Design a protein with these regions (language model features):
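Bacterial N-terminal signal peptides
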Residues: 4-14
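Beta-propeller-forming repeat regions
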Residues: 17-484
């Protein structure tokens, strides 16, 4: 029973279709009226559009992972025009997903592109029919990811050009390049933006050779995963540029030229309207500019690596030429099946001492969550997941600039995996965690059987000199238990 439950939870995402493996089913919340974070599987590529043509914006989200590949439709129930945060219906799979799917809105119609192709009549064809846009779709040689293509009338001449953001990985060289002080010795990620100018028309397009776009006299280069969005963010009538990145932030390039002759100023890392850095909770972010709330300015609908999607609302204000956005707020859906970010690592235990088995789980973001079993026997009713705290703070382990062997580009991942045991033999459940760092940590339960409370982490030490992987740049001491 416990083994099957683990498999089902790891597989769970927020849609109610059975797993295509004999005997396995996703765990349902069995909790009508419960709202949870809207989400798909690993990697969310939001395609906001009026999917069902009922006059409001729905969320269509592409999820290119396995085993839950698909494009999922989250219906906006239409409970009030201008409602920024409707509780979406549970997802319906409406087609197959590929990587790099991006939406463009042309003359009021949603058009979906992936690198080099347009997906034709996608409502009818389940995103399965494509049209090649140019003979050579490979705009940059070498190690590339995040080849993000969109339509935009770049130069205001009335036809749709193509812009493409491309992430380049050739300088990063991926792994094991820290010096003894934990400083990365290889290069960074790059995120470039290219233009394919349409010298024809929309009915008979003819795309010119690629142009690499510049800002402030230098090539536009963000930290990978550029997701370029051209829109009038500052309300002056021309198209500015806003990019995402492989980490969690945004870069803004003001158009200091004109609508027909764009020229971009130096990129500025964005802050929110409160003066703090404008960042998502996780990374590998995929922003799409759209007037989500119908107030006349361009908001951002942004996907995270763990399948969640957030709204970053434009306040309508511009400060020093930079649009002012509110911090992200994550959308919610009607609860369907249990999900905890991506790559969930569930452990079944009676955490709250009430006689039934709950679920404690880690995930890619480095959190540890508690799903409380509210009863129901063989078909339990589950509460919304709660992130655990330790030492009075939300328990979250992240790599930071040097905790992942695979480079600083994994700074916001934690990959928490765990067990629950009475480590100190005091009759209470403690938490034992491994993570992206490879150090085994003990979180002592200093609460009670019915109300667990975790102390701050302590390293686990064993007698004798412990072996340490040769590729570690850091040293936690001779006795500290480390892995990997």
């Amino acid at each position: 029973m416990r083994f099957l439950l683990v498999i089902a939870i790891v597989a769970a995402i927020g849609v109610s279709r059975p797993v295509s493996a004999a005997g396995l089913e996703r765990l349902n919340y069995n909790n009508p009226g419960l709202n949870v974070d809207l989400g798909v599987g690993l990697w969310a590529w939001p395609l906001p559009m009026d999917w069902d043509k009922d006059g409001d914006l729905d969320l269509v989200v592409a999820c290119p992972d396995k085993p839950y590949n698909g494009v999922y439709f989250f219906e906006n129930p239409g409970n009030g025009k201008g409602n920024k945060f409707p509780v979406f219906k549970a997802a319906k799979r409406v087609g197959k997903a590929g990587h790099n799917m991006q939406v463009s809105h042309v003359d009021g119609e949603a058009r979906v592109l992936r690198d080099g192709y347009e997906l034709i009549d996608f409502r009818k064809n389940g995103f399965g029919k494509t049209k090649k846009l140019v003979p050579n779709t490979k705009l940059l040689e070498g190690k590339t990811r995040a080849r993000m293509w969109r339509y935009v009338d770049y130069d205001g001449d009335g036809d749709q050009d193509i812009v493409a953001g491309i992430g380049y990985w050739g300088d990063l060289e991926w792994d094991h390049a820290y010096d003894a002080q934990g400083v990365w010795q290889n290069g960074p990620l790059h995120g470039y933006v290219y233009l394919l100018r349409n010298a024809g028309s929309d009915t008979k397009p003819f795309y010119m050779e690629k142009e690499q776009l510049k800002a402030g006299g230098s090539v536009i280069d963000v930290y990978g995963w550029p997701s370029p969005n051209f829109a009038d963010f500052d309300g002056d009538g021309d198209l500015d540029l806003l990019c995402g990145e492989f980490l969690d932030g945004f870069t803004y390039f003001e158009n200091v030229g004109s609508r027909k002759n764009p020229e971009y100023g130096n990129g500025r890392k964005m802050k929110n309207a409160h003066g703090d850095s404008l960042v998502m909770d996780l990374q590998m972010i995929t922003p799409t500019a759209i007037d989500w709330d119908g107030d006349g300015d361009q908001d951002l609908v942004v996907g995270d690596e763990d399948g969640r999607v957030a709204l970053i609302e434009h306040t309508g204000r511009v400060n020093g030429g930079v649009p002012q956005f509110l911090p992200p707020v994550y959308f919610e859906q009607e609860a369907s099946t249990l999900k905890y970010g991506a790559l969930a690592t569930p452990f079944c235990v009676d955490w709250d001492g009430d006689g039934d088995e709950d679920i404690i789980s880690g995930n890619t973001a480095g959190y540890v969550g508690f799903f409380e079993n509210l009863g129901g026997g063989e078909n339990p009713k589950w509460a919304r997941v709660v992130n655990l705290k330790a030492g009075g703070r939300t328990l979250r382990i992240m790599a930071g600039p040097n905790g992942s062997i695979q480079s600083p580009c994994e700074a916001k991942w934690g990959y928490t995996t765990l067990s629950v045991a009475d480590w100190d033999h005091d009759g209470l459940h403690d938490l034992i965690i491994n993570s992206i760092w490879g150090e085994i940590l003990w979180y002592r339960n200093v609460g009670t059987k019915g109300e667990p409370k975790l102390a701050a982490a302590e390293a686990i030490e064993l007698e004798g000199r412990m072996p340490k992987p040769k590729w570690f740049w850091w040293d936690g001491g001779e006795k500290q238990l480390v892995t990997q």
